[in-house]
Regions:
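Active-site proximal loop and beta-alpha junction motif in alpha/beta enzyme cores
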Residues: 1-241
Length: 241
């Protein structure tokens, strides 16, 4: 919405065919390059592109995320390890686009493909997630986050519909009906980092340009991740977009 709004309000001059707009996220410090379809220098809203969980169709907006690593904590792996044991549960704490805590759904006694409504009704589950999130935040150097919405939390499991991995994304005290793009970036990156909770589920290796498809309650979300060859040594700049 930011890109089309900026053009419509005259903040940005539209180009012929398409317009690239650079956006800075004040929440994480990351840079997002949005490509807006602008035939005849006008924003095009109509189209046949669909986003799972979003009603209707429209013109696609391509988002390229940059400077994603360590925006909040200053580290790719805020605990300095691909996994950490918190309250007896193995978790991965990662700061890519959004600081997150990830765990295997089976360690919480669920399959991982439950609906968001079912998970939101499971008060015991939500309480356990919040307890681990608060403890993880301390280990991530984020302090007391009891009144904050980050880090986010995700429960991961094997894909069931042709994707790479299944995620249930918590924002943080309720399960998202679909999935946040920032959280998708973080989970997709975790799939490509050796020994994380995510990579133990997917068992894939980074090739440099990887498509990660995340299954969420209402469909799929695709992430294209460009990495350097230093991905397994946790180089701070390994994620380029």
């Amino acid at each position: 919405a930011v890109g089309p709004f900026a053009i419509e309000k005259g903040m940005i001059d539209a180009k012929e065919i398409k317009t690239n707009i650079v956006i800075r996220s004040v929440n994480t410090g990351s840079i997002i390059e949005a490509t807006i379809q602008t035939p005849n220098k006008k924003v095009k809203y109509s189209g046949d592109y669909k986003i799972a969980g979003v009603p209707g169709e429209g013109s696609p907006i391509l988002l390229k995320f940059k400077n994603l690593v360590g925006g909040v904590t200053g580290k790719l792996l805020p605990t300095d390890h691909p996994t950490t044991i918190i309250n007896g549960i193995e978790v991965t704490c990662l700061d890519v686009s959004m600081p997150m805590v990830m765990a295997n759904a089976k360690d919480f006694g669920i399959v991982g493909n439950e609906t968001s409504n079912d998970l939101n009704e499971n008060k015991t589950l939500l309480k356990k997630i919040e307890e681990i999130r608060l403890s993880a935040a301390l280990k991530m150097g984020m302090g007391d986050v009891s009144g904050k919405v980050i880090p986010k939390f995700a429960l991961l499991s094997k894909p069931l519909n042709g994707g790479t991995i299944t995620s249930r994304y918590f924002t943080p005290k309720t399960c998202h009906e679909t999935h946040a793009a920032t959280g998708s970036n973080c989970i997709a990156s975790a799939c490509l980092i050796s020994s994380t909770v995510a990579s133990k589920i997917t068992n894939i290796e980074a090739t440099g340009n990887d498509k990660i498809t995340i299954e969420h309650p209402l469909g799929l979300i695709d992430c294209l991740v460009e990495t350097s060859t230093t991905v397994n040594s946790f180089d701070k700049n390994f994620i380029k977009s």
